[in-house]
């Protein structure tokens, strides 16, 4: 079945053979291995003095090229509506320190577009975490879908950039960053609208949880939920609601959307990543 011009997903727009071809490109043993080795998906990345700046694309270069070729061939044949887009709902980074709180240093983490030669943060989504702020959970939300194209000799896609500053007397690992995301590829791009700031509850990790009575855990959870309005858990920064037709699960609890036309829905509004301390 050729492309029908509807807003359905790519796998519904194309034939089973075409869908299988795309699945093989994304989930072949080689592609999965490169997602781990080149992108550090779900792996702990150690920040050392000899690795002070890390740029990790969300799609391996080889996989990017094959997916782009797949969409281009479908577009040239008139079967697909575009040459392909990459959609990422959210990038979640768990950051933990591996030195004492007395160490003087910080990490600067942001989301960038490899199509930007300067690698500037997307819509100023950038956060600086001092060593004493860790551990922390950082959430980035791209505000647009990335076209599957090449810019010069660069394969364009989103990337997580991590910079290590300070830690003068520490040459070894001072922090560990574990990033997770889910990339989707489609011949149609999504629309993104602004909503009010959301709230996230993160309970401290209890190493003695197995030896704690269930009733005590239940009381702790109930107490935290009752105090959710406390400033410790309020994320005051604006976030992006992604009205994409996908089945991905929402990790952040969102409040109702802002009324269109209000001052808070202005495009000039600064977007910032959400940070939660106390993992």
UniProtKB/Swiss-Prot annotation:
Which domain of life does this protein belong to? Viruses
Keyword entries, A-Z:
Host cell junction, Transport, Viral movement protein
Q: What's an example GO cellular component term for this entry?
A: host cell plasmodesma
For biological process, the GO terms are: transport of virus in host, cell to cell
* Subcellular location field: Host cell junction, Host plasmodesma
What family does this chain come from, according to its entry? Belongs to the cucumovirus movement protein family.
Q: What does this protein do?
A: Transports viral genome to neighboring plant cells directly through plasmosdesmata, without any budding. The movement protein allows efficient cell to cell propagation, by bypassing the host cell wall barrier. Acts by forming a tubular structure at the host plasmodesmata, enlarging it enough to allow free passage of virion capsids.
For this entry, the protein name equals Movement protein
């Amino acid at each position: 079945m050729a492309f029908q011009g509807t807003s359905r997903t790519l796998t519904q727009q194309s034939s089973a053979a075409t869908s299988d071809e795309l699945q093989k490109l994304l989930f072949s043993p080689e592609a999965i291995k490169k997602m781990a080795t080149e992108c550090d998906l779900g792996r702990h990345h150690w920040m050392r003095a000899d690795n002070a700046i890390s740029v990790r694309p969300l799609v391996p270069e080889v996989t990017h090229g094959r997916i782009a070729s797949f969409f281009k061939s479908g577009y040239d044949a008139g079967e697909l509506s575009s040459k392909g887009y990459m959609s990422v709902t959210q990038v979640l980074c768990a950051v933990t320190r591996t030195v004492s709180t007395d160490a003087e240093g910080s990490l600067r983490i942001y989301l960038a577009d490899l199509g930007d030669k300067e690698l500037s943060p997307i819509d100023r989504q950038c956060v600086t975490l001092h060593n004493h702020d860790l551990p922390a959970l950082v959430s980035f939300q791209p505000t647009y879908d990335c076209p599957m194209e090449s810019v010069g000799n660069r394969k364009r896609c989103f990337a997580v950039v991590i910079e290590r500053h300070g830690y003068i007397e520490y040459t070894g690992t001072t922090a560990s960053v574990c990033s997770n995301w889910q990339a989707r590829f489609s011949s149609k791009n999504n629309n993104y609208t602004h909503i009010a700031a959301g709230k996230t509850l993160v309970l401290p990790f209890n190493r003695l949880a197995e030896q704690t009575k269930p009733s005590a855990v239940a009381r702790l959870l109930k107490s935290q939920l009752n105090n959710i309005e406390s400033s410790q858990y309020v994320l005051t920064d604006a976030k992006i609601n992604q009205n994409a037709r996908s089945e991905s699960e929402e990790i952040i609890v969102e409040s109702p959307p802002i009324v269109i036309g209000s001052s808070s829905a202005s495009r000039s509004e600064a977007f910032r990543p959400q940070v939660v301390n106390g993992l």
